[in-house]
Each structure stands twice: as C-alpha cells, then as structure tokens.
Amino acid sequence: MARKGNPISVRLGKNRSSDSSRFSEYYYGKFVYQDVNLRSYFGSIRPPTRLTFGFRLGRCILLHFPKRTFIHFFLPRRPRRLKRREKTRPGKEKGRWWTTPGKAGPIGCLRDDTEEERNEVRGRGARKRVESIRLDDRKKQNEIRGWPKKKQRYGYHDRTPSIKKNLSKSLRISGAFKHPKYGGVVNDIAFLIENDDSFRKTKLFKFFFPKKSRSDGPTSYLRTLPAVGPSLNFLVMQYFFNTKNQMNFDPVVVLNHFVAPGAAEPSTMGRANGTGDRSLQKRIRSRIAFFVESSTSEKKCLAEAKNRLTHLIRLANDLGFAGTTKTTISLFPFFGATFFFLRDGVGVTNNLDAREQLLNQLRVKCWNLLGKDKVMELIEKFKDLGGIEELIKVIDMMIEIILRKRGIPYGYNSYFNEVQKMRSFLSNRTNTKTLIESVKIKSVYQSASLIAQDISFQLKNKRRSTHSIFAKIVKEIPKRVEGIRICFSGRLKDAAEKAQTKCYKHRKTSRNVFNQKIDYAPAEVSTRYGISGVKVWISYSQKKGGRAISETYEI
C-alpha cells in the first residue's frame, strides 16, 4: 500500500524536470531566496491586502556572483478585470496611461482619484512582470529578435531557502556568497550594517526608518515597517555591486509607490475630500520632498535651483498632481524609476562628453514625459549654476523601466525598443555582455513552495486560523491548478494539549499516481506553542493546449 505522506509522483524525474507549462520559482527566485530576506521578498511580490502594502513600483534587487550580476526589476501589469469594471462604471475616468494608446509618459501619471480605484488597479488579479537583467562577462552572442521567443524553464532542484531574521547573518551563510574570493566582501557588508553609525545617520536611512524600534541592535530597523525590509535589502546588494565592480556612486534612491509614514511634508493645498485623498497627498508630497533632498546639494550655488524645483513641485501639487489636462505639470516620471547619483572626480564621471550626453538624454526624457518649458529651463539652470565640473550630484546614469500601455507580447515594439537601448547602455558602461529577460508571472498562488512559506509566516504571527488561511488560498489559485491539499500538524491552539493534524482539500487531489503532475513542498514554523508543520500538494491539470503559467521572452 502506498504511503500517503510521501507522494510517489514527487520523486519521479519528470515532475522535477523543466516544463514550459508549469510555474517554477527556481528560475528567478532561488538566488533571491538564498541571498535576500525571504519575508521581504515574498511581501514584495504578493498581491496587496488591507493589512499589507502589497506590490511596490520600482522594486529592484541586485545579486552579484563570481562571473555575472543579476538585477531583478519587479513591475506590475494591468489586471484583466479592469476591462469589465470600466464597462460597468461609465462615470469613471478612462483616459489612463495603461489603457490610452499613444500616451506620452507611461510613468507620467501614477495618481488614482480614489482609494477604490487604486485597489482596482493593484488588485489581487494584477499580473506581475519581472525584468531580470543579467550582466555576464562571458563571450556569449545574444541575437536581437523582433518577435519574442519562449524559452524552457530550469527544473526543480533545491527547494530549501535560508530564512534568517538577521540580514547580515543571512549574507554570511548564504550559499551563493560562500566563494572564498568574496568572503571578505560579504563580511564587510555585514560589518557596515551592524557597526557603521554614519550609514544609519544618512537622510536615505532616516527616510526609510523614521522611527527607531524599541528593540536594541542595528538590525532591529527591519521590523519597523513592512516596506522597510526590501528597501534595506536593495541598499545592501547595491553596496555589494559597488564594491566588486568599482562603480563609485552614492546609495541608489528607489522611490516606491508607498513610503514610510511620518516623512510627508506639510500640505500645500486645502482640505481633501476624504481620508484616502489626504493619505495619497501625503505619500506624493513625501516622495517629492525626498526627491528634492536627494537630487540637490547644500551648496549655495544650487540653492536657487533647489528653491525653483520646490516651487515647481508645489505648483504641480496645487494643479492636481499629474493630471491629464494641459495646465498640469506631471513630475511622476521620477517616481517608479531608479536613479544613480555619482560623484565628481571618481571613476567614469571624469568623462565630460559622456556626462553631457547623459544630460541630453535626460532632457529628451523630460520633454517626452513632461513636455513643459519650465522643466527644460530647470535642467539648464542646474548646468549653468555649478558647471559640469563643480556639480556634487548629477544624474549620470539613469536606468528607467518604461511601463507601457500593453504587456508582452502585445505592444512589443515600444517595449523592446526601450529594453534594447537599456541593454546597449549597460553593456557600454560595464564592458560586459548584457542579457535582458522578461518573465511574465500570472499568479503567485500556484507553487507549493511559496504557499507553504506564506502559511508558515501566518502561523508564526498568529494572524488567522487554519480554515481561514485555506479559504483565502482557494480563492487565489488559478484555473490551471486542478486541486490542492494542505495539512497542518502540531499544537495549533493554546487549548490543545496534544498535537493534532488537520487536512483540507479542494477539488481533485491525488498523491500517489504515477502519471500525475504534482508539486509538493513542506515547511516548519516555530510558534509559541511548539513546532508546527505544513505540507502542500498541488495537482496540475493534464489538459493540453492550456496557457503557460509563466513565460519567458527572449529579447
């Protein structure tokens, strides 16, 4: 008789091999699991809820290996249910940047009128796209194709991630950074987080951590806010990238869609219509104020330019934040993008021709996205006040992911053109072969490993009961999944004197059939009542011709 607790089909080779119609977190997530805090990573890709921030624009993770560097950009996609809602709501505004063809400024309008509309856009059905940029110094020719081509995924291998509360410890013991040549660099990163007081006194650190945690230790800041962990992880990986490649620049500014509360500047407008509008205004003003502080200097030569920029931003706020009218000044292309602020006299910044060319590119970007003469004059003012040689901070490298009105492969011309420019730009600046891959993920709740980890986090925090956890997962699973079975074991309640096992199943599930496609993952969690275990089985449909759960398009 077959053992129910150890499925035979999981041990089959075909269920571990690559399959283009299956979701594989190993393809893009294994390195992230090992080298970045899993709690922060999972919180950045999961759909938003009422208690969490959800998905954030401009998320970026850098992973450096002996011969290549991975840069992961996480970008949202337009939800499919938005079309149906627009038909039933004729009074709502339809001229949005993700639906209007030929819109100048794909990132130029991130404002939504109400909290309901923003939840509608970033709802649970919102799809994600991962921009994975691999900087590979191996001599590998990458053919540029006009039409995207599907690629096969890697197989399932090691599913066990290294989950550590302390980020510095996770960097020290992670498998990807165990190389002896990079041991000293990893120790320097951990030492910087734990012992560098000047780093914790910077404006960038105070922006993401406005309030000090009650617990002692520098790493206690990780538990301050839900949006804090990914930002700090990004800074750490960026510091590692800086050390190995000798690219001297200040910490990267990532302007997320949500910011830490308490960092907002005073309101410049009258009373808002509702609580949601007031909170949105605070978030927008806090992002704008932080951009002004980061992009300008304390020198007297830039004081006038800083005042003009601040006045221009406040004028944009009073006009209605990045609206679609001709009298509105939109500054939102700066939000959701990634800026590299380099210093003068270091590395490649001595090349005046390259800097002039980059500033010209920035002028073109602003003209296309903003289209305002005042912004053009402001850029010229930055150059005239301090001069090219005396500027302390200038935008020397700008990697901007353009969000187009349609996803891959629809509207591939405009998207692929931007990706091609980015690839050539990175190749010239880093002297390496650059490969950009776009991965479209349709749903998160179709991998047993991710579901098991999510359940373990909820049990540890004692947020919900086992029944409510299972009911929520059932609502999120896609149609491709034929059935799901979840088993909880251990002391699940305080009143339970003995350990017990609870199993829930939905639809058709089978754990011991040879010809069945099954994904299996266990997880353990330490709760206040003891150690509890979670096991997840997912049965996939055997029908042919179904859509792939995750697709990769070669550019």
Swiss-Prot record:
<keyword id="KW-0496">Mitochondrion</keyword>
<dbReference type="GO" id="GO:0006412">
    <property type="term" value="P:translation"/>
</dbReference>
<dbReference type="InterPro" id="IPR009019">
    <property type="entry name" value="KH_sf_prok-type"/>
</dbReference>
<protein>
    <recommendedName>
        <fullName>Small ribosomal subunit protein uS3m</fullName>
    </recommendedName>
</protein>
<dbReference type="GO" id="GO:0003723">
    <property type="term" value="F:RNA binding"/>
</dbReference>
<dbReference type="GO" id="GO:0003735">
    <property type="term" value="F:structural constituent of ribosome"/>
</dbReference>
<dbReference type="InterPro" id="IPR044954">
    <property type="entry name" value="Ribosomal_uS3m_plant"/>
</dbReference>
<comment type="similarity">
    <text>Belongs to the universal ribosomal protein uS3 family.</text>
</comment>
<dbReference type="InterPro" id="IPR001351">
    <property type="entry name" value="Ribosomal_uS3_C"/>
</dbReference>
<keyword id="KW-0687">Ribonucleoprotein</keyword>
<dbReference type="InterPro" id="IPR036419">
    <property type="entry name" value="Ribosomal_S3_C_sf"/>
</dbReference>
<dbReference type="GO" id="GO:0005739">
    <property type="term" value="C:mitochondrion"/>
</dbReference>
<feature type="region of interest" description="Disordered">
    <location>
        <begin position="1"/>
        <end position="20"/>
    </location>
</feature>
<dbReference type="Pfam" id="PF00189">
    <property type="entry name" value="Ribosomal_S3_C"/>
</dbReference>
<dbReference type="GO" id="GO:0005840">
    <property type="term" value="C:ribosome"/>
</dbReference>
<dbReference type="GO" id="GO:1990904">
    <property type="term" value="C:ribonucleoprotein complex"/>
</dbReference>
<keyword id="KW-0689">Ribosomal protein</keyword>
